[in-house]
């Protein structure tokens, strides 16, 4: 689709950006584009650049067969240099010579308040009507507001309308059976970067540690907000999350399965050049950096999406609370450049002193007995 023929750059506003892409939100009146985001590539050095066409093929041919129900639908659209140049890029440099962009649904479309929890976990609270706030945009609660100041702000903008949905945005990172290390790869990297502990993604994989993992995730939600969600609005977040994780085919288990290294040549420690980076390793490294939107939503019998055939198996009834729709979407499937192997090696070298260390402020990660000849990470 030649998107520049049905819309103008002025109808797209800056929404968010990552390391490789920038997102624009549609604000015009075209029904087809409403509730959509346009993903455009940020400027990269030519040798590290992966074209949008190559990325699109990678997602459709390599990733979607693995996660046919979780990966959001994307559409390849044709751009022009003039169109890209006129986008409100908020000072970011775009890859203006790239002829293609990606059109995708806006999972956060609607009235959501963002609650920053940690680098790899955000919370979004959705209400059924717009809440008017004095000088505060509900979609962009400042992350710098913490502690008492943040609680004060929350009380001032208390939810006067019913909360009908909760979304967790999580980057699960590396998922595998930790055999012997005190800290998993993700927790080790977070310590290396100087972050405070929030949760260990490995806890979400095993029945005996799920509750601990969920308690850790929920621990950074202000208590009054958690009560507002779980008790006042009767969305039993922990119970819903546990039901989601107890499904043996949940997305965390699937990611763990497809991140598994089955060939010793694909172990990062064995890579010596770009020629050692196989297609399988590129896929694995992509899956180790994806993001998830996990949504718990009150069932609405008048909502056609809730009643669709695709969601028959996603409806959960909880006694005393009612019926809920549980959905999960995967995003951020960026094919990794083979040139990143140097960065991977450098990072692994820095992590060696952390894997088996003991940090009094960081609980050791779960260890499991392995009977499957696991080659490691």
Swiss-Prot record:
GO-annotated molecular function: ATP binding; inositol-1,3,4,5,6-pentakisphosphate 2-kinase activity
Extent of motif EXKPK motif: 169-173
Compartments, record wording: Nucleus
InterPro entries: Ins_P5_2-kin, IP5_2-K_N_lobe
Chief location bin: nucleus
Catalysed reactions, as listed in the record: 1D-myo-inositol 1,3,4,5,6-pentakisphosphate + ATP = 1D-myo-inositol hexakisphosphate + ADP + H(+)
A Gene Ontology term for the protein's cellular component: nucleus
A Pfam family matched in the record: Ins_P5_2-kin
Keywords: ATP-binding, Kinase, Nucleotide-binding, Nucleus, Transferase
GO biological process, one term: inositol phosphate biosynthetic process
Group of enzyme by EC: transferase
Entry's EC annotation: 2.7.1.158
Domain of life of the organism encoding this protein: Eukaryota
Protein purpose: Has kinase activity and phosphorylates inositol-1,3,4,5,6-pentakisphosphate (Ins(1,3,4,5,6)P5) to produce 1,2,3,4,5,6-hexakisphosphate (InsP6), also known as phytate.
Similarity comment: family membership: Belongs to the IPK1 type 1 family.
Comment on protein domains: The EXKPK motif is conserved in inositol-pentakisphosphate 2-kinases of both family 1 and 2.
Identification of the protein by name: Inositol-pentakisphosphate 2-kinase
Native source organism of the sequence: Debaryomyces hansenii (strain ATCC 36239 / CBS 767 / BCRC 21394 / JCM 1990 / NBRC 0083 / IGC 2968) (Yeast)
Lineage: Eukaryota, Fungi, Dikarya, Ascomycota, Saccharomycotina
């Amino acid at each position: 689709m030649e998107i520049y023929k049905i819309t103008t750059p002025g109808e797209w506003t800056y929404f968010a950006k990552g390391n490789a892409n920038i997102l624009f939100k549609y604000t015009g009146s075209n029904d087809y584009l409403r509730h959509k985001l346009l993903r455009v590539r940020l400027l990269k050095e030519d040798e590290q650049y992966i074209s949008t066409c190559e990325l699109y093929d990678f997602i459709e041919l390599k990733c979607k067969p693995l996660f046919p129900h979780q990966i959001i639908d994307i559409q390849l659209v044709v751009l022009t240099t003039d169109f890209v140049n006129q986008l409100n890029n908020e000072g970011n440099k775009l890859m203006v010579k790239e002829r293609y962009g990606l059109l995708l649904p806006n999972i956060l479309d609607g009235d959501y308040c963002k609650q920053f929890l940690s680098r790899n976990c955000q919370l979004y609270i959705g209400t059924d009507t717009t809440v008017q706030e004095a000088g505060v945009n509900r979609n962009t609660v400042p992350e710098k507001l913490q502690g008492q100041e943040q609680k004060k702000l929350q009380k001032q903008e208390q939810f006067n309308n019913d909360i009908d949905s909760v979304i967790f945005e999580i980057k699960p990172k590396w998922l595998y059976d930790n055999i012997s290390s005190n800290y998993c790869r993700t927790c080790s990297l977070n310590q290396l970067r100087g972050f405070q502990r929030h949760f260990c993604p490995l806890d979400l994989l095993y029945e005996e540690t799920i509750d601990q993992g969920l308690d850790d995730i929920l621990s950074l939600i202000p208590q009054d907000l958690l009560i507002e969600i779980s008790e006042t609005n009767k969305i039993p977040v922990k119970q819903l999350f546990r039901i989601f994780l107890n499904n043996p085919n949940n997305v965390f288990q699937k990611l763990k399965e497809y991140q598994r290294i089955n060939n010793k040549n694909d172990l990062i420690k064995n890579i010596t050049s770009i020629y050692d980076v196989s297609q399988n390793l590129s896929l694995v490294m992509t899956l180790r950096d994806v993001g998830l939107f996990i949504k718990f939503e009150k069932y609405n019998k008048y909502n056609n999406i809730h009643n669709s055939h695709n969601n028959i198996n996603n409806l959960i009834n909880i006694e005393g609370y009612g019926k809920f729709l549980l959905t999960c979407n995967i995003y951020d499937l960026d094919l990794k450049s083979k040139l990143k192997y140097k960065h991977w090696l450098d990072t692994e070298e820095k992590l060696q002193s952390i894997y088996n260390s003991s940090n009094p402020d960081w609980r050791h990660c779960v260890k499991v007995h392995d009977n499957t000849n696991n080659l490691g990470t």
